[in-house]
């Protein structure tokens, strides 16, 4: 059956700032306390969506979350009106204010893990929300992510959206950023690779930085998504590269159709994994980048592998890269060698995503891949699909509500909270989502 990959990109939120919240993500730590530009961040992301949509790659948008998220501050014991809560937390515990103001939901590769209908036992598209248990600021995302996905994939005959796994370390799940799918055409059954960093009883794990994904979580997600057991491989990420800043697998590998583009050191027991894939995936091609060409350190600093590998109608592939790759002589030299070599990659597309990159999120972090048949695509909420009208409406919306300068101190401004709620109220109507945000259901909005 014919099917297409639709990239659902996260729209950067109004409180995008640099707080260094993500230990193990070296860009996040390095840019801590720098001044951010939320308006520019949102526009950089929107431009990527529009350019790819114009090039014929189906694109859609997933909206930001409510931030600062006051209900969590109340759970932490701060009392009073919303304004009083903001004032108290800013004075007594500013780190909590930064955490509940994080715009991290923009990286929707961590929103959920997807199983296309061609891979599932019941023939539905399954989406399991990620619990993002390893980082407090990200663990807050799951309930609203679930509401948003149910508003976008709202046809229960075709889509099953599953709640996140329990919030415990044993079941730490980081979503599609630790998941790849390999196979022929999108509509054909594929081989799903669930990548984990640690498992109970196995001493092979990183020592410097945390392994955010557990094998136990990956196995549970595969069950929830009803993936045919014959179409699943569980693979461990190389703990040594986690300790070098590869906090998700999409920082060291990316797949599309029959191609796996990865670093030579991406996986534990890599030669064994690739042999297994060659035996089980027709036409499988591994493009392994040797450490002598690109070091793990350079891969992390440029986000070479946090790229999007997209299929054109003629079977060739485009690699979507951050500008940092072009600015690194060694990486750019390797990429031009790659273009000249015998493989399906025939085009490089470069985007300026510096605002997201400075927090450790490249092109692949910003998108959730969902393979859909034509019938399934028609069942998706049409208001989120990117086109000229939506692009212009979202640009105008960003111009109206987003600030062009934000520091950690600005997060305590009650006006920022009011601006954010008004903006999301308008956006949820524009995208026909209903009342997906807690403040709307509490009577604070019109959505």
Swiss-Prot record:
Pathway(s) annotated for this protein in UniProt: Amino-acid degradation; L-arginine degradation via AST pathway; L-glutamate and succinate from L-arginine: step 2/5
Annotated positions binding substrate: 19-28, 110, 137-138, 212, 250, 359
EC number: 3.5.3.23
Protein biosynthesis found in the keyword field: no
Active site: 174, 248, 365
Gene Ontology biological process terms in this record: arginine catabolic process to glutamate; arginine catabolic process to succinate
Keywords: Arginine metabolism, Hydrolase
InterPro entries for the chain: AstB_sf (IPR037031), SuccinylArg_d-Hdrlase_AstB (IPR007079)
Entry GO MF terms: N-succinylarginine dihydrolase activity
Reaction equations catalysed: N(2)-succinyl-L-arginine + 2 H2O + 2 H(+) = N(2)-succinyl-L-ornithine + 2 NH4(+) + CO2
NCBIfam families in the record: arg_catab_astB, PRK13281.1
Summary of subunit composition and partner proteins: Homodimer.
Function, in words: Catalyzes the hydrolysis of N(2)-succinylarginine into N(2)-succinylornithine, ammonia and CO(2).
Similarity section: Belongs to the succinylarginine dihydrolase family.
Protein name from the UniProt record: N-succinylarginine dihydrolase
Gene: astB
């Amino acid at each position: 059956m014919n099917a297409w990959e639709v990239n659902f990109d996260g729209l950067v939120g109004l409180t995008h700032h640099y707080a260094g919240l993500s230990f193990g993500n070296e860009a996040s730590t390095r840019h801590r306390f720098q001044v951010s530009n939320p308006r520019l961040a949102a526009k950089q992301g929107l431009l990527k969506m529009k350019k790819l949509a114009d090039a014929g790659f189906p694109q859609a948008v997933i909206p930001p979350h409510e931030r600062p998220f006051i209900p969590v501050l109340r759970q932490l014991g701060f009392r009073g009106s919303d304004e009083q809560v903001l004032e108290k937390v800013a004075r007594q515990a500013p780190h909590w204010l930064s955490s509940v103001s994080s715009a991290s939901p923009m990286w929707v590769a961590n929103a959920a893990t997807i199983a296309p209908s061609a891979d599932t036992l019941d023939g539905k598209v399954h989406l399991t929300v990620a619990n993002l248990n390893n980082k407090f600021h990200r663990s807050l995302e799951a309930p609203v992510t679930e509401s948003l996905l149910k508003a976008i994939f709202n046809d229960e005959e075709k889509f099953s959206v599953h709640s996140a796994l329990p919030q415990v370390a044993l079941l730490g799940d980081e979503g599609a950023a630790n998941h790849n799918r390999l196979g022929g055409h999108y509509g054909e059954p594929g081989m799903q690779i669930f990548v984990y960093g640690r498992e109970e009883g196995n001493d092979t794990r990183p020592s410097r930085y945390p392994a955010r994904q557990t094998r136990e979580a990956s196995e549970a997600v595969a069950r929830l998504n009803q993936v045919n057991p014959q179409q699943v491989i569980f693979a461990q990420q190389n703990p040594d590269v986690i300790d070098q800043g590869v906090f998700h697998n999409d920082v060291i590998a990316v797949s599309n159709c029959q191609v796996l583009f990865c670093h030579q050191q991406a996986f534990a027991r890599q030669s064994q994994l690739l042999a297994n894939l060659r035996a089980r995936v027709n036409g499988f091609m591994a493009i392994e980048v040797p450490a002598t060409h690109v070091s793990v350190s350079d891969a992390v600093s440029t986000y070479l592998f946090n790229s999007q590998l997209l299929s054109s109608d003629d079977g060739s592939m485009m690699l979507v890269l951050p500008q940092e790759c072009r600015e690194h002589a060694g990486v750019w030299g390797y990429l031009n060698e790659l273009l000249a070599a015998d493989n399906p990659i025939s085009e490089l597309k470069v985007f300026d995503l510096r605002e997201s990159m400075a927090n450790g999120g490249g092109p692949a972090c910003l998108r959730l891949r969902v393979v859909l048949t034509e019938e399934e695509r028609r069942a998706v909420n049409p208001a989120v699909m990117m086109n000229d009208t939506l692009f212009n409406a979202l640009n105008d919306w960003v111009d109206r509500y987003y600030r062009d300068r934000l520091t950690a101190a600005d997060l305590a401004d009650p006006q920022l909270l009011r601006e954010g709620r008004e903006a999301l109220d308008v956006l949820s109507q524009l995208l026909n989502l209903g009342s997906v945000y807690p403040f709307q259901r509490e009577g604070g909005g019109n959505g």
